[in-house]
Amino acid sequence: MELNVYKVMNTIINKTIIMCGIFSLFNNKYAFKNKYINEQFMLGKGRGPEFSKLEQVHDKLLFGFHRLAINGLNNESNQPLKIDDVTLICNGEIYNYKELYDMMNITPSTDSDCEVIIHLYRKYGIEYTLQMLDGVFAFVLVDNRIDKENNTSGNVYVARDPYGIRPLYMLTLSSNMFDKLDVLPPIYGFASEIKMFSNIYQSFIKNEIGNNYKIEQFMPGTYSKLSINISSQPIWRVVKYQQTYTMPGFSSTKMLVDNDYDSIIKNIQTYFFSAIKKRVITSERPIACLLSGGLDSSLVTAIVNMYMKEITDVPLETYSIGLEGSEDHKYARIVADYLGTNHTEIVMTEEEFISVIPEVIYAIESYDTTTVRASIGNYLIGKYISEHSEAKVIFNGDGSDELCGGYLYMHKCPDSIEFDKECRRLLKDIHTFDVLRSDKCISTHGLEPRTPFLDRAWVQYYLSIHPDIRCHTKNKQCEKHLLRDSFSGKYFVDKNGKPLLPDVILWRTKEAFSDGVSKNTRSLYSIIQEYTSLDDTKEEGGEQHEDMERNEKKYYKDTFNSYYPNMEQIIPYYWMPRYCSASSSSARTLDFYNEKMNH
């Protein structure tokens, strides 16, 4: 089977749907015409296929919003949301909005959970607002009130949730001269996807306008402020750039003093049950779970199933995907039978996996090898659910390996301090890799992903546990031992005395999603490399694998560049295992893989 990126790419923009999406553009008065801007805005319509609106909300400030309604299903909840002089666009879900309204003694004017952001901001300001929100979000808020103290006629705040679960990109275009006569003010933009800015960005480069143009990830856990100064040139300027308002978890100086194991187990259960329950009860749309049969997705599915049984008699929908004979199908079926879910096995061919790669790269806006491999199955399962189910809210098990140190290479971690450091590094960068995949592969099909393992309170508690207890390598235990033990039959059974999961699932060794979709004897990475390698690399020899790996990377990068030229900086580095000699990101290539799988 031949892969022709140039043949496939021309069909993707018309066939790819992209959950809610936001778009904003500052200081665009002379550079781009409204018709052109609207065309770029509409490239993101798939994230919110149910409603779209582009609106001028302030002088030289344009807001755009695409909506997929999860809560507040009436038209009054459409965005931009406006209360007096404050206007908001937000891609997110605020899980504690009802509690916040009760605390403020405020009756909302719409059913949108995002409206609470405006009320919090008006009463308490931006920093306290961000501390109070429990949810996932990327938002742009404009305050049109004149601020005499700071001499401004408008202030805008842009913010993103602590782990970047909702995507957000920042566009910066600066020019010394425009038409060689008029000074062109700097243009700023914020959007949920690169594709809404790509053509605008390329036009600056192509026409050699200016000396500063970039598209970058807006950092999680930060906010920025833009203002118009009354006494100077009336343009929007960045006055505070990505100011940190939260850190991913507690610092090492705030570890728990009480290390009583039974108390820790109880707290782990309490925080994680809460993380899932809030995500179940705040959805007004049907729910489904992605179920690979691994520990993480199985834990999430089991607890979602437990809460759904309190709400409805209709069995929870679960989905697994893989090639014929894949490891994930086998274990997912065990979990589904144990829990009594309405399970669907999606069996795909090698050709179906391979042929969709260009679509995947266009959707996820990345060329990182690990991310692309893992995204193929994610993208196809999202596509299947969107075409065959009424479910709109899709639970996943992503984030656990970063938080709990679940990757197999962590067995080579030298000590518990390094273990803690590596977990925090993985969480800090997760928006560039796994979270990017888990959001875009699902939202690209008009669905909303929910990721309870990255719940703010849960993450902060888990990281507050002393590393000696979290670090399985120190105690020569299987990966994520503390998490597994916390939900084992020893510590948790339901009202009928039944464990949450069978032991064969609870203690199943970590298998990457991109590996688990295939057989042990024929891994997905090797299938891809067969298709993407050049003929002259298919020779016997010690360097054959490295050549095939390079060709795979080149194919992904070339495909990415065909959609998003001059944007290679959007990923900071290639994701790779650490603490060991690795030429591939697949755990199946590591020297100790078979040892762990047979343990």
Please annotate each region the language model reported.
Residues 16-366, 392:
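Cysteine-centered catalytic environments shared across enzyme families
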Residues 193, 243, 466-468, 502:
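Short, solvent-exposed coil/turn linker segments
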Residues 81, 108, 485-486, 535:
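Short alpha-helical linear motifs
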Residues 10-18, 26-32, 145-148, 155-157, ...:
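ATP-dependent adenylate-handling active sites, centered on carboxylate activation for C-N bond formation
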Residues 502-508:
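Conserved S-adenosyl-L-methionine
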